């Protein structure tokens, strides 16, 4: 799941500044501020998840966080249309950052908690590899989708972000299924 949430986050975050620049005429500096907002709410989400100490609450963090990230990512889609203000993407990215902030560290804690101490290094490596692979695969896939949909003008951004939403929806579904059996 960490590869999914991280890959979808990074991929969307790569395309949002380009969308704001191309569709809404924002300067690169203005468009780049969206990455700051996502980082700030990621930190807030991480802080919040660190305050959850009940086992039941900790088990829910990945599904709640993934759901929030999905909603926030979907909220950025309307900003791909010139008639909708680019600020919509900023608001959506605030929400998405909160979601990944809840999920990402909770998955690390969960992974290490179910691993014997002598295998923590392996688990940590596997989580890092999932992050890297998720990011690399989704960015590459999104680049292919964007190139294929480029003739659709601003709708090419919709294609990419919607694809990341589908991936997050899959992650949400898988996480909810795992929670039923763990």
Predicted feature locations:
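12-transmembrane solute porter fold
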Residues: 1-181
């Amino acid at each position: 799941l960490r590869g999914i949430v991280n890959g979808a986050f990074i991929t969307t975050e790569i395309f949002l500044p380009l969308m704001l620049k191309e569709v809404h005429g924002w300067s690169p500096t203005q468009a780049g501020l969206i990455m700051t907002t996502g980082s700030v709410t990621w930190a807030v989400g991480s802080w919040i998840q660190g305050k959850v100490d009940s086992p039941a609450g900790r088990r829910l963090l990945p599904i709640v966080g993934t759901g929030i990230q999905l909603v926030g990512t979907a909220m950025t889609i309307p900003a791909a249309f010139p008639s909708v203000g680019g600020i919509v993407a900023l608001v959506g990215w605030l929400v998405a950052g909160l979601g990944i902030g809840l999920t990402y560290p909770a998955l690390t804690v969960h992974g290490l908690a179910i691993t014997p101490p002598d295998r923590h290094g392996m688990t940590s490596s596997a989580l890092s590899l999932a992050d890297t692979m998720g990011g690399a695969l989704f960015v590459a896939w999104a680049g292919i989708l964007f190139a294929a949909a480029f003739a659709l003008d601003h709708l090419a951004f919709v294609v990419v972000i919607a694809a990341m939403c589908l991936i997050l929806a899959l992650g949400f579904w898988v996480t909810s299924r795992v929670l039923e059996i763990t």
